[in-house]
């Protein structure tokens, strides 16, 4: 069976390139981030990498204190609601929202005035610069709030039915921590034996798919938002798709 890998393209979406070996190959994007002087200001740390495991990078100072405060403020202005999972396709083209007992956080989406806010725009441009993937491939920022004892049990960001959508599936998650948490609230990757501690300005980047088969979920990056024990945790999440997400989404596709 022919295998494929994802090749980073600064000018557009990822390209699928045939390779002769079905072995997992590293994303060129991750190699570029780690090796390029351009990104050293974000202090990229390799937490996991092939061949031992999937790529997992951690950054520091990806967003400033001012930017973090503004995103928290924008989330408060929009209003946080109970987080839900994406459900079944409805006759009107939308998807139902399913409450999940394993997910007790609250969130909102950076749309309308938030989407055009200069700081939100700047943050999304920075993610585009780091990943080399157009902002159009990303869902709107999801702004999250975890209060005491709130959590999100082990899960993957990969959504199978999106394979049949023009957007393709989520291939990458870029998660940013907007504040320090007094206790708890880490992001755990159980299959990698890794837990990332929340810290303002810190970010984590990982793939949801296999490099040699970007249509298939990589279960090794299943992760869990551990319960907040003391304080409140704020975060911002960018889910990046194989192809343009925003245009088909606006068209109801």
Q: What is each PLM-predicted segment?
A:
Residues 1-205, 209-253:
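Fe(II)/2-oxoglutarate oxygenase catalytic core
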């Amino acid at each position: 069976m022919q295998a494929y890998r994802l090749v980073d393209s600064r000018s557009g979406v990822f390209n699928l390139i045939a390779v002769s070996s079905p072995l997992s190959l590293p994303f060129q994007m991750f190699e570029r981030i780690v090796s390029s002087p351009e990104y050293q200001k974000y202090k990229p740390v390799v937490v996991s990498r092939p061949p031992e495991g999937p790529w997992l990078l951690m950054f520091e100072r990806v967003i400033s204190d001012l930017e973090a405060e503004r995103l928290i403020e924008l989330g408060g202005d929009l209003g946080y609601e109970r987080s839900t999972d994406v459900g079944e396709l409805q006759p009107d083209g939308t998807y139902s929202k399913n409450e999940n007992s394993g997910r007790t956080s609250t969130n909102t989406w950076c749309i309308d005035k938030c989407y055009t806010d200069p700081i939100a725009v700047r943050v999304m441009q920075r993610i585009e610069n780091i990943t080399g993937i157009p902002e159009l491939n990303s869902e709107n920022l999801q702004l999250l709030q975890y209060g005491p004892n709130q959590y999100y049990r082990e899960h993957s960001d990969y959504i199978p039915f999106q394979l049949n959508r023009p957007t393709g599936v989520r291939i990458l998650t870029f998660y940013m921590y907007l504040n320090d948490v007094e206790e708890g609230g880490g992001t755990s990757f159980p299959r990698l034996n890794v837990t990332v501690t929340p810290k303002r300005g810190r970010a984590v980047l990982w793939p949801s798919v296999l490099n040699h088969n970007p249509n298939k979920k990589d279960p090794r990056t299943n992760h869990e938002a551990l319960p907040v024990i003391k304080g409140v945790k704020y975060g911002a999440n960018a889910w990046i798709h194989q192809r343009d997400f925003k245009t088909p989404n606006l068209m109801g596709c």
